[in-house]
Amino acid sequence: MLCLAGAAFISCVGTAPTKEVHLVDSLNQVAYTYRYKNLDSSYHAASKAYQEVGLYSQGKAEACNNLGFCAFMRMDFEEAEKYYQTVYNLTKNELELLVADIGLMKIYQRTALNKEFYDYRNSALRRMKRIAED
């Protein structure tokens, strides 16, 4: 009996609690909903989602994409780049990575970093192809 309990405990290590997932997902949804309506509200919700993450790295990646968008809209390209780059260390989710690719493309287009723009454009195209295959 002790072995089974130990095995069950080990299999759950690293899994985000349901309550955390629901909270972070709802905050990210609010951030996304307000992105073109009220940028401050979008930023506040995304920032709260980022802070509330314990184990839910997927939710943190989405929060980073939302924070990157807010920073981009404020024309704080360095901050936006930092958030988008963070996504690559948090998740393997192709959709979140695609959002980060496109966010970085927008930054590099605006800042005339053409090589970087095309690097992330090619990454986004490959990612879209993989997503379409799935």
Q: For each predicted feature, which ranges?
A:
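A "functional boundary" signal
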Residues: 9-134
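Bacterial N-terminal signal peptides
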Residues: 1-8
